[in-house]
């Protein structure tokens, strides 16, 4: 732009400063001190790292395996190898007790890089035990890395920074899905698959050591040794029952509708190009914008209002697809439903992640957060597995309406869950790092 319409250096600096301030205001971080804003960069890096292996598992491998002649049933069955994401709580104490969490991230990501680099050396068409073991290693390392990243982030981010941090966190994760997932599939059109996996492995290796750019966070020795007491005191009372039920049910509607969105587009007669452009690419962009906006909302109005208001918006958005199915609203109606669902999905995700972070004790976050994330991820895998049966039996419109109803029980639990929320953000202060 400067080449066509030259700007004075002073005006250029003012323009850049205004854009930067707009971004901070959008996040609700305009009053945060500079050290707090630097933490947001660390959070963005870590969650880009966290989302990268998932992009290979969800976006790249299904395409690769299908091109190798693997059946749809077998590809679907491979989702069972993702169970480590739901079981990671059982080995999270190891991450909590031993070593620097940054080095856990480095080690896991380096192992993931090796696993991805080995993929083209195995005959995927046979779907033999060697490939299954390699994929299980990949998912286990990815799940373990999640434990380290989530724990580190809870310790890094102060209460006043949680809204903005979770907006950045959800957005960076989605950007990784686009860059490493969609980008890899795009490159597969011009590169051989073995080169593509080697390139991805190289990127993963670089990302592994980039984690050391994050500041070192020390856990007190007493917190490391007494992790079990910290967990049982936190969860071992009757007031924990509403918390667990809330985590189980808050994203039920999202988990139920997700697997059926793309098949619905197909059955509406939309082209592959439209599906790739609108609900996939544009949808992820909108979810990133929604996550950032959700972080700004939470920074201003607090986590309780966030999970209530933003969660309800996310639930209501499922009805958009129901109306399209019931009343045959055509292409524009379908596009509108997609825009609403994608943006509000980002809003609800930012609120939920902020809630999970807030209810954990910072000194015992490794096990506590791993427990909560295991609970809701298990719910997602179970409800997703039967979503096709539900849509087939009652029809798309009724099923999408049912996903809205499934979202509602969580909100009835909010009066009991509210007591778990720590001091609401006041947009001041920051955690100490060394």
Model-derived segments and spans:
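Juxtamembrane intracellular "pre-TM" segments in multi-pass secondary transporters
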Residues: 22-37, 216-244
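Transmembrane alpha-helices of Major Facilitator/SLC transporters
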Residues: 84-88, 278-299, 310, 317
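Helix-to-loop junctions at the C-terminal end of transmembrane segments
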Residues: 87-100, 289-303, 391-392
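C-terminal ends and interior cores of transmembrane alpha-helices
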Residues: 106, 110-125, 313-329
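Symmetry-related core transmembrane helices of the 12-TM Major Facilitator Superfamily/SLC fold
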Residues: 113, 195-212, 400-416
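C-terminal transmembrane helical hairpin of 12-TM major facilitator-type secondary transporters
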Residues: 305-352
